[in-house]
């Protein structure tokens, strides 16, 4: 990206040298945030009839969280690039088991693990050591929500957790948003699995995604403030 702005960048094993460069490209588009797309892709994973368009996102991305493409494909999504962005389609071929190391993509853990729990997918996950250090202790949040879905989530090692398969989904769950924007948005998307979700302390989405609730309504989700 810096080279596209005309900078001269020299990389060595221990040093990055940036020199004054030439003229940047006439126009540079900024790619949307892949981590925000994780909530919509979790909804697509949970709903077998889903097809969503992620505007201005492409499979060829420099963002680490674009690992969502690999995750999505393993969890039954098919991706198609079009001019407007990226279409994700649920193929109805969800696996019975899924494993992933979230060390490089910690913000994806919440929505993906919850989607697996809602879909009845068993899993083994690693790279979760940083989750208690986020806006809330997200491991506690995951454990509570997973249990409310009728599944289990137990620690098996340092940063390693195992997800057991749920039984029957409940008709409705209540989630404490913990003042954590990602807990709130991940929990809200569980409604794509066909259950009612009451989210307490939901205002925190304004930190990273102020238009989240309006976009949910525009996408056909129904909700009301209690």
Language-model features, listed with the residues they occupy:
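Short, structured segments at the rim of ligand-binding sites
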Residues: 1-226
């Amino acid at each position: 990206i810096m080279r596209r702005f005309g900078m001269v960048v020299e990389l060595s094993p221990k040093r990055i040298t940036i020199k004054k460069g030439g003229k940047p490209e006439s126009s540079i588009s900024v790619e949307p945030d892949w981590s925000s797309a994780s909530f919509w892709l979790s909804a697509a994973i949970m709903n077998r009839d889903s097809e969503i368009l992620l505007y201005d996102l492409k499979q060829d991305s420099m963002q680490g969280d674009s690992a969502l493409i690999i995750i999505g494909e393993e969890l039954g999504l098919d991706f198609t690039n079009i001019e407007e962005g990226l279409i994700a389609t649920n193929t109805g071929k969800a696996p019975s088991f899924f494993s992933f190391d979230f060390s490089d993509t910690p913000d994806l853990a919440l929505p993906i693990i919850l989607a697996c729990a809602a879909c009845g997918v068993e899993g083994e996950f690693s790279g979760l050591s940083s989750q208690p250090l986020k806006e809330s202790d997200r491991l506690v949040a995951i454990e509570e929500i997973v249990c409310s879905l009728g599944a289990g989530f137990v620690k098996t090692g340092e940063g390693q957790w195992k997800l057991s398969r749920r039984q029957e989904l409940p008709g409705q769950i209540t989630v404490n948003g913990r003042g954590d924007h990602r807990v709130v948005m991940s929990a809200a998307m569980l409604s794509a699995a066909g259950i009612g979700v009451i989210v307490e302390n939901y205002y925190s989405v304004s930190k990273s995604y102020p238009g989240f609730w309006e976009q949910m309504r525009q996408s056909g989700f129904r909700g009301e403030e209690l």
